[in-house]
Amino acid sequence: MPTINQLVRKGRRDKIAKVKTAALKGSPQRRGVCTRVYTTTPKKPNSALRKVARVKLTSQVEVTAYIPGEGHNLQEHSMVLVRGGRVKDLPGVRYKIIRGSLDTQGVKNRKQARSRYGAKKEKS
């Protein structure tokens, strides 16, 4: 417990909020190369095979990123764009791959929320 005099001299130190997407180094997105593409199972109440990729970013950090949407064309050495955003039922997955940019194709036959999955508007 500091004395009044110590507080006058030094003051209190502000708490620093922990950055949730440290690997992006303050950028909205980062480019990276897939080093491994695989499936993993989610936490307890859920059951599925979630598609994830291990990505080496341009910031020299290797992260695990989720591949959203149904079906994908990613394989090892694919160039991808990674954004922040965790997947609640996959521990350690704090990034998502942006569909429809670089080597990642958009989701086929997507009608709603197309911009999130890089799907072009179909001609009617």
Swiss-Prot record:
Residues 108-118 have a biased composition (Basic residues). GO terms for biological process: translation. The modification 3-methylthioaspartic acid is found at D89. PROSITE patterns: RIBOSOMAL_S12. Gene3D superfamilies: Nucleic acid-binding proteins (2.40.50.140). GO terms for molecular function: rRNA binding; structural constituent of ribosome; tRNA binding. It holds the Pfam family Ribosom_S12_S23. GO terms for cellular component: small ribosomal subunit. CDD domains: Ribosomal_S12. Residues 105-124 are annotated as: Disordered. Keywords: Methylation, Ribonucleoprotein, Ribosomal protein, RNA-binding, rRNA-binding, tRNA-binding. Part of the 30S ribosomal subunit. Contacts proteins S8 and S17. May interact with IF1 in the 30S initiation complex. Belongs to the universal ribosomal protein uS12 family. NCBIfam families: rpsL_bact (TIGR00981). With S4 and S5 plays an important role in translational accuracy. Interacts with and stabilizes bases of the 16S rRNA that are involved in tRNA selection in the A site and with the mRNA backbone. Located at the interface of the 30S and 50S subunits, it traverses the body of the 30S subunit contacting proteins on the other side and probably holding the rRNA structure together. The combined cluster of proteins S8, S12 and S17 appears to hold together the shoulder and platform of the 30S subunit. PANTHER family: 30S RIBOSOMAL PROTEIN S12 FAMILY MEMBER (PTHR11652). This is Small ribosomal subunit protein uS12. It comes from Mycobacterium sp. (strain KMS).
